[in-house]
């Protein structure tokens, strides 16, 4: 989607209501550098989709640190009417569930790739998906390939089906069953799951050029220009378009012709030509249905291209014969889709599959089929025509499982179910059902088949990473090993110490923090609560922590919402979420979560800084962590619930990730209660970490944190949260549910929600930078209330994925570079240091400058790091 932008001023941009589904415009806060980064992913498209949701007020907003998220952009803000609007987990914060490395993913061209190969080599490749609503397989481009660390105590689930298909992934990864999606952990032996029976072929890489401009010497220059504009020349072996061209050429040799005036026409059934047209459109070629059984290509240039690729000959072109197996497979599937016979059975025995054409071409086809272990004979018919015949059962099975048909939906679906049946025959002894019985009992539209699960195991992963793929298609699934698969915050603690006092002991201090505050992937807290004991934490948040000795009573005055959202309901949180959260309470986690010892090195507003208790040269500590696995599980649980409910409420669904329900619905209110519980867990978590930070300072400096070191909390802000607030819209006060995803509340002076000790100057806003760069403290403003529902940015925002960062940076080198700059880093692994390299993030100075110039937050102070502890 190309999203138009209208410049308002130097740092404000508007996404106009260019799509009739948009209820409001989009508003983007960014300079030109930051905006260009947003254009490189789906940030602006996601903001456009948010603008389509019911009950939205004013704008769909993107902060300068905005980047692509799940459903909503990270750095996105949207306010919905509490009566007419919606609530969406994707607008508050959500991650992904994943599959094991080595999992094979099926592409549109019929070859498999390992899921971990996708990010580097095949990000432009389209994948096969199951279009649930229309009941057939389809193709989709990839939105993202994501990865995450496997937790130290995390288990994976491995399931095996009766035909030997295996899938292994995180416990929360969904697979498709006849009744809908089910988490891997909930699959039981004897259950049925949906599989895509096609086996396909391995990928073979071939380098070089198939066709370049020299092939068109003497032709009209417009032909070359047309083809170059559509990236159809030069045509290289590695180009994903080659597979499409191979199957179109196969179809054209049987059911296409080029007229004397260079018009290209395909003929066939309407549903077949519809599929051909989709492939043509993917190449940028327009085609129109001239009659019920004819599809005409409007460009003579494409006809010239097919001629050069071999359509004018009565034999298979050399480039197909010389090509890798997957290219041959696409050519043959297009050819048999056009003119091959549909597979039929007599009881449990398959009848021969035939193809009628010239003897020369059939001889070529027979030779190519041998590479797929398919034996064929060529026979002469009564009328002098020639027929290729595949008649032995092994060859029929290999043809259906490795080649099959393209373009003809009926042939393809029946061929897939037939292949599954022939595999089923091998496994069954006696009492064998006929093919037609099997198709009725196990077959689904599109050629999908229900297979019984014969083994389910919980296993300890022998690998470090899980992977997942996001696709653009609304089906939001992909074929993996033949199976269809489918609140955070920041706290700032001040001290009375100066850099001069801390610098000599910075290594000892950071090492002590690292020792006392559990961190790392799957890290567990120092206290041991059973999952049945955390309901009080979910209700009382930071108050529970203080009541249990983790902090001081006055801490609660300095936390957003007092560290406790009213209305949290532990009953709305699943047992699984509690089981994930309980052992992690009081731990930092990994990735971009951190403890950072900082020095206030610049004061922009002395009056406000004084109110916040800050001075130049002062040492402060910043804590960034959230609700850990509990918060993720809450979002995951309710996404599934809402996906089932959304059709009931007839809510627009512009993006599969952007699931939502009416805020006042039963599902909406229950999710809001669960989200509050997750937020309370996060506040309790940061409160416990604060207690251990104070203990660490006491251990190193031998001084009392309260009486000597003055280690008060400056403030604690949430940046993945939904809140019911009152705001002014078009001169009227309205109640809204504000979604802040990777965005921070920024209330102005005088607002009743701002703590009394800061009410004269405005709410503190904490903006962490990336590792090794500055962080900022700002103050909320009236400008934020007027423009952004009292919201501003939350940090620097990534520009490189974690995988890309590890390819570009080495953790040990980054750590040494930071040490050379006077920043000591202690991390659970050097990989995390590489993932969090400063270059993996946007320039936080630019981000803060934009919000300051926009007047949606006011600069107060800048802090630079001198010590970092990371999980």
Swiss-Prot record:
InterPro entries named in the record: Hint_dom_C, Hint_dom_N, Hint_dom_sf, Homing_endonucl, INTEIN, Intein_C, Intein_endonuc_central, Intein_N
Role description: Essential for tRNA splicing and maturation. Acts by directly joining spliced tRNA halves to mature-sized tRNAs. Joins RNA with 2',3'-cyclic-phosphate or 3'-phosphate ends to RNA with 5'-hydroxy ends.
Phenotype upon changing residue 870 to A: Abolishes tRNA ligation activity in vitro. Can be rescued in presence of archease (PH1536)
Gene3D superfamilies the record matches: Homing endonucleases (3.10.28.10), tRNA-splicing ligase RtcB (3.90.1860.10)
UniProt catalytic activity: a 3'-end 3'-phospho-ribonucleotide-RNA + a 5'-end dephospho-ribonucleoside-RNA + GTP = a ribonucleotidyl-ribonucleotide-RNA + GMP + diphosphate; a 3'-end 2',3'-cyclophospho-ribonucleotide-RNA + a 5'-end dephospho-ribonucleoside-RNA + GTP + H2O = a ribonucleotidyl-ribonucleotide-RNA + GMP + diphosphate + H(+)
Residues reported in the UniProt entry to bind GMP: 592-596, 719-720, 768-771, 775, 794-797, 870
Keyword Transcription regulation recorded: no
Catalytic residue positions: 794
UniProt remark on cofactor binding: Binds 2 manganese ions per subunit.
Ligand binding (Mn(2+) 2): 488, 624, 719
Enzyme Commission identifier(s): 6.5.1.8, 3.1.-.-
Species, as recorded: Pyrococcus horikoshii (strain ATCC 700860 / DSM 12428 / JCM 9974 / NBRC 100139 / OT-3)
Regulation of protein activity: Activated by archease, which accelerates both the RNA 3'-P guanylylation and ligation steps. Archease also expands the NTP specificity of RtcB, enabling the efficient use of dGTP, ATP or ITP.
Record GO terms (molecular function): DNA binding; endonuclease activity; GMP binding; GTP binding; manganese ion binding; RNA ligase (ATP) activity; RNA ligase (GTP) activity
Reported effect, residue 802 to A: Impaired formation of guanylylated RtcB intermediate
Subunit structure as annotated in this protein's UniProt entry: Monomer.
The protein's name: tRNA-splicing ligase RtcB
Other facts: Ligation proceeds through 3 nucleotidyl transfer steps, with 2',3'-cyclic phosphate termini being hydrolyzed to 3'-P termini in a step that precedes 3'-P activation with GMP. In the first nucleotidyl transfer step, RtcB reacts with GTP to form a covalent RtcB-histidine-GMP intermediate with release of PPi; in the second step, the GMP moiety is transferred to the RNA 3'-P; in the third step, the 5'-OH from the opposite RNA strand attacks the activated 3'-P to form a 3',5'-phosphodiester bond and release GMP.
Post-translational modification note: This protein undergoes a protein self splicing that involves a post-translational excision of the intervening region (intein) followed by peptide ligation.
Domain DOD-type homing endonuclease: 248-374
Cofactor list: Mn(2+)
Family under the similarity heading: Belongs to the RtcB family.
């Amino acid at each position: 989607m190309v999203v138009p932008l209208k410049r308002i001023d130097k740092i404000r941009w508007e996404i106009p209501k260019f799509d009739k589904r948009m209820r409001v415009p989009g508003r983007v806060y960014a300079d030109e550098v930051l905006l260009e980064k947003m254009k490189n992913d789906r940030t602006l498209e996601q903001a456009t989709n948010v603008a389509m949701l019911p009950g939205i007020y004013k704008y769909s907003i993107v902060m300068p640190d905005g980047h692509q998220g799940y459903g909503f952009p990270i750095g996105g803000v949207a306010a919905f009417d509490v009566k007419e609007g919606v609530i969406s987990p994707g607008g508050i914060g959500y991650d992904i569930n994943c599959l094991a490395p080595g999992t094979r993913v099926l592409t549109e061209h019929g070859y498999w790739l390992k899921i971990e190969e996708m990010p580097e080599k095949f990000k432009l490749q389209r994948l096969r998906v199951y279009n649930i609503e229309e009941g057939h397989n389809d193709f989709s481009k990839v939105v993202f390939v994501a990865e995450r660390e496997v937790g130290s105590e995390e288990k994976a689930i491995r399931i095996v089906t009766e035909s030997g298909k295996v899938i292994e992934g995180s416990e929360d990864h969904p697979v498709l069953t006849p009744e809908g999606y089910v988490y891997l952990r909930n699959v039981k032996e004897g259950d049925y799951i949906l599989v895509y029976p096609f086996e396909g072929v391995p990928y073979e890489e071939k380098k070089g050029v198939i066709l370049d401009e020299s092939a068109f010497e003497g032709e009209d220059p417009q032909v070359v220009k047309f083809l170059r504009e559509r990236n159809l020349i030069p045509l290289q072996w590695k180009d994903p378009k080659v597979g499409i061209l191979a199957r179109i050429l196969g179809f054209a040799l049987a059911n296409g012709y080029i007229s004397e005036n260079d018009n290209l026409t395909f003929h066939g059934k309407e549903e077949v030509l519809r599929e051909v047209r989709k492939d043509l459109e993917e190449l940028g070629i327009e085609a129109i249905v001239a009659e019920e059984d004819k599809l005409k290509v409007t460009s003579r240039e494409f006809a010239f291209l097919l001629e050069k690729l071999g359509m004018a000959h009565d034999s298979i072109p050399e480039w197909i014969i010389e090509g890798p197996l997957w290219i041959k497979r696409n050519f043959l599937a297009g050819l048999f889709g056009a003119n091959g016979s549909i597979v039929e059975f007599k009881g449990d025995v398959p009848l021969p599959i035939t193809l009628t054409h010239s003897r020369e071409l059939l001889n070529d086809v027979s030779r190519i089929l041998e590479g797929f272990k398919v034996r064929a004979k060529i026979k002469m018919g009564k009328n002098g025509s020639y027929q290729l015949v595949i008649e032995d059962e092994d060859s029929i099975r290999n043809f259906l499982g490795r080649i099959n048909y393209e373009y003809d939906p009926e042939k393809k679906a029946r061929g897939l179910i037939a292949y599954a049946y022939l595999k089923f025959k091998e496994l069954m002894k006696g009492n064998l059902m006929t093919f037609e019985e099997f198709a009725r009992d196990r077959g689904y539209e599109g050629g999908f088949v229900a297979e019984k699960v014969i083994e389910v195991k919980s296993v300890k992963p022998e690998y470090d990473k899980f992977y997942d793929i996001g696709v653009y298609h609304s089906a939001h699934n992909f074929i993996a090993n033949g199976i269809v698969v489918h609140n955070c915050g920041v706290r700032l603690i001040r001290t009375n110490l100066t850099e001069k006092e801390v610098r000599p002991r910075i290594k000892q201090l950071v090492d002590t923090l690292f020792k006392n505050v559990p961190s790392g992937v799957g890290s567990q807290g120092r206290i041991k609560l059973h999952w049945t004991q955390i309901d009080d934490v979910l209700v009382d948040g930071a108050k529970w922590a203080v009541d249990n000795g983790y902090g001081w009573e006055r801490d609660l005055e300095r936390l957003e919402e007092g560290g406790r959202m009213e209305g949290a309901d532990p009953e709305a949180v699943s047992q699984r979420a509690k089981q994930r959260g309980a052992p992690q309470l009081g731990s930092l986690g990994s990735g971009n979560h951190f403890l950072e010892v900082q020095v206030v090195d610049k004061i922009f507003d002395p009056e406000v800084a004084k109110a916040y208790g800050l001075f130049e040269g002062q040492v402060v500590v910043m804590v960034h962590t959230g609700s850990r696995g509990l918060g993720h599980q809450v979002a995951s649980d309710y996404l599934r619930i809402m996906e089932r409910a959304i059709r009931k409420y007839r809510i627009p669904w512009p993006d599969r990730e952007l699931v939502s329900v009416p805020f006042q619905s039963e599902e909406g209110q229950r999710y809001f209660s669960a989200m509050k519980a997750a937020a309370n867990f996060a506040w309790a978590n940061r409160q416990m970490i604060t207690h251990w930070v104070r203990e660490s300072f006491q251990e190193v400096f031998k001084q009392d944190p309260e009486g000597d070191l003055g280690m008060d909390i400056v403030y604690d802000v949430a940046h993945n949260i939904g809140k019911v607030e009152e705001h002014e819209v078009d001169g009227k006060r309205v109640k809204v549910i504000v979604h802040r995803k990777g965005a921070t509340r920024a209330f102005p002076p005088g607002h009743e929600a701002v703590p009394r000790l800061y009410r004269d100057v405005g709410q503190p806003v904490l903006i962490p930078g990336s590792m090794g760069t500055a962080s900022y403290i700002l103050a909320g403003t009236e400008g934020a209330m007027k423009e952004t529902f009292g919201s501003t940015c939350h940090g620097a925002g990534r520009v490189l994925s974690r995988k890309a960062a590890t390819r570009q940076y080495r953790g040990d080198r980054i750590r040494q570079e930071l040490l050379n700059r006077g920043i000591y880093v202690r991390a659970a692994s050097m990989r995390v240091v590489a993932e969090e390299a400063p270059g993996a993030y946007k320039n936080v100075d630019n981000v803060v400058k934009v919000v300051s110039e926009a007047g949606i937050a006011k600069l107060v102070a800048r802090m630079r790091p001198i010590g970092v502890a990371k999980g």
